[in-house]
């Protein structure tokens, strides 16, 4: 067994993981491909580089991300502590000087005796023809037709060296690093092609997605059920020879509650359509445009093909009867359950690239969603992430290879703080595994770490957090069964409901936050 834990990726999750391991007096080898190679979005050589907004969102406990940050402060997160130190004025939000932030994280990790930072790319491409053919034929639920290649958009230092006659050093493979050792993969949404290929081989054909094209997710209790109704297409519809009373009794007693349906009349639909086609969209990066739009069309783009296009697509009303009128609606929007608790619903077919404010404005025009609370807005961007519900448990541990953990956005958590949280959880559990295996090895039980089975480590103590905490709820979300899994950020919709119903949203979120912090305090004492 190797006398260290390997972390691949020096972003937010990987940097947090390396710190948490090192502070527990275990050696860490942290692999970072910069400056040897840069992704299309990265530009400096420091660890924990922030490439988008410099905001870590609200500090208020009545905000889901604010609660998550407070939990991480209680758990001695290096990155949140550093963010607090280099904060810039931002009202109630935590915003940072991005250059100072990444510089400080790099300096602190370099100063730790137990951390060795290795500036090399990890990943073995193998036969490029085989790889290309495989990935071009790969179809993840009709969402991806080919693997995006960052080589088309950026050129590595390594490639330039080859052209100048400088010898290229071989990259290190994931297979090599994980042999008889524990590995955390924290390579983010722009994971390199070579490592992506190894992850595909590790997780299987359906294990890896290359972009995020997600519809908005809505909190169920904010849906107006005096307008919306339950039912599946065709079975909910009133039969030609079925009288109204019989039909109403049938649908009332029906167990087919897979969808919440939002009916629209002609006037409502045309008002919605007019606002949708003129709404503002997010400008995509050049490297994102090709792969996203060839695999999944945004609803606003589809709408611009004609006023009735949506009515023959995701908003087709065939197979439904509006309980209020007894007639087929002019158009219908369907919501599908998104989590096992049944308190989050996604908008079917509403993958979108609209700005967040525009999503709130336009989608609230849909009858039944006039007061909707959006747990997550729709997004379309390059985002490499694994099918976590199939592959990981709540500790971010790979089920079929127990010596491998994942952390960060590659697991399907979305956001800076969420990535940090996942890195912390993965690190704590990798330490637990390391110490257990080290004890076993010392007692000569000859337990190997490569390709560990769940059975082989059935006695391994796992470090999980209460589901009432935000850090625990995120871990549970990515590990829970979900046939339509999409990345998720911190939001109060993923927490268990309070025993009492509270209409005042601020009061409700305050009580959820108090409960979370009490639960976390309880296990830390």
Role assignments for model-derived ranges:
Residues 2-13:
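Beta1/beta-strand and adjacent pyrophosphate-binding region of the FAD-binding site
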Residues 431-438, 446, 451-488:
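Active-site-proximal substrate-binding core of FAD-dependent oxidoreductases
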Residues 19-80:
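N-terminal FAD cofactor-binding segment of flavoenzymes
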Residues 346-413, 420-421, 463-476, 487, ...:
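A glycine-rich dinucleotide-binding beta-alpha-beta segment and adjacent secondary-structure elements
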Residues 115-128, 166-335, 349-356, 360:
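Predominantly flavin-linked oxidoreductase catalytic cores and closely associated redox partners
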Residues 485-525:
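C-terminal auxiliary extensions adjacent to catalytic cores
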Residues 98-117:
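Helical element adjacent to the flavin cofactor pocket in flavoenzyme catalytic cores
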Residues 419-433:
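An active-site-proximal "capping" alpha-helix that borders the catalytic cofactor pocket
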């Amino acid at each position: 067994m190797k006398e260290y834990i390997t972390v691949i990726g020096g972003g937010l999750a990987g940097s947090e993981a390396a710190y948490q391991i090192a502070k527990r007096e275990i050696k860490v080898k942290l692999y970072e491909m910069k400056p040897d190679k840069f992704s299309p979005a990265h530009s400096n050589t420091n660890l924990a580089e922030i490439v988008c907004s410099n905001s870590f969102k609200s500090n208020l406990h009545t905000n889901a991300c604010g609660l998550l940050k407070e939990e991480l402060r209680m758990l001695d997160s290096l990155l949140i502590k550093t963010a607090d130190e280099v904060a810039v004025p931002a009202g109630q939000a935590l915003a940072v000087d991005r250059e100072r932030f990444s510089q400080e994280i790099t300096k602190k990790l370099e100063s730790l005796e137990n951390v060795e930072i290795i500036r090399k790319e990890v990943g073995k491409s193998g036969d490029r023809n085989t790889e290309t053919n495989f990935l071009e034929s790969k179809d993840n639920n009709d969402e991806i037709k080919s693997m995006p290649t960052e080589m088309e958009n950026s050129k590595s230092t390594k490639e330039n060296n080859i052209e100048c006659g400088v010898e290229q050093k071989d990259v290190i493979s994931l297979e090599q690093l994980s042999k008889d050792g524990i590995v955390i993969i924290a390579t983010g949404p722009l994971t390199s092609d070579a490592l992506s290929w190894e992850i595909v081989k590790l997780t299987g054909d359906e294990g890896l997605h290359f972009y995020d094209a997600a519809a908005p997710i809505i909190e169920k209790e904010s849906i107006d059920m005096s307008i919306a109704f339950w039912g599946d297409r065709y079975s909910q519809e009133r039969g030609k020879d079925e009288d109204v009373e019989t039909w109403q009794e049938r649908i009332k007693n029906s167990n087919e509650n897979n969808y919440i349906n939002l009916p629209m009349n002609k006037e409502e639909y045309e008002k919605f359509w007019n606002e949708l086609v003129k709404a503002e969209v997010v400008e995509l990066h050049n490297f994102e445009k090709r792969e996203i739009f060839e695999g999944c069309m945004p609803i606003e783009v589809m709408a611009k093909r004609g006023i009735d296009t949506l009515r023959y697509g995701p908003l087709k009303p065939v197979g439904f009867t509006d309980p209020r009128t007894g007639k087929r609606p002019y158009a219908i929007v369907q919501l599908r359950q998104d989590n096992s608790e049944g308190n989050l619903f996604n908008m079917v077919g509403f993958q979108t690239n609209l700005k967040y404010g525009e999503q709130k404005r336009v989608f609230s025009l849909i009858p039944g969603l006039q007061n909707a609370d959006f747990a997550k807005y729709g997004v379309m961007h390059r985002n490499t992430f694994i099918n976590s519900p199939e592959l990981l448990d709540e500790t971010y541990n790979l089920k079929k290879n127990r010596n491998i953990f994942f952390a960060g956005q590659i697991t399907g958590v979305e956001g800076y703080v969420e990535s940090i949280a996942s890195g912390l959880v993965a690190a704590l559990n990798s330490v637990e595994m390391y110490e257990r295996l080290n004890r076993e090895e010392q007692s000569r039980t000859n337990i190997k770490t490569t390709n560990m089975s769940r059975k082989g480590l059935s006695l391994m103590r796992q470090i999980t957090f209460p589901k009432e905490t935000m850090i625990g709820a995120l871990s549970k979300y990515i590990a829970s069964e979900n046939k339509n899994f999409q990345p998720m950020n911190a939001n109060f919709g993923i927490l268990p409901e309070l025993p009492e119903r509270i209409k005042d949203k601020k009061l409700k979120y305050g009580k959820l936050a108090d409960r979370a912090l009490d639960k976390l305090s309880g296990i830390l004492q």
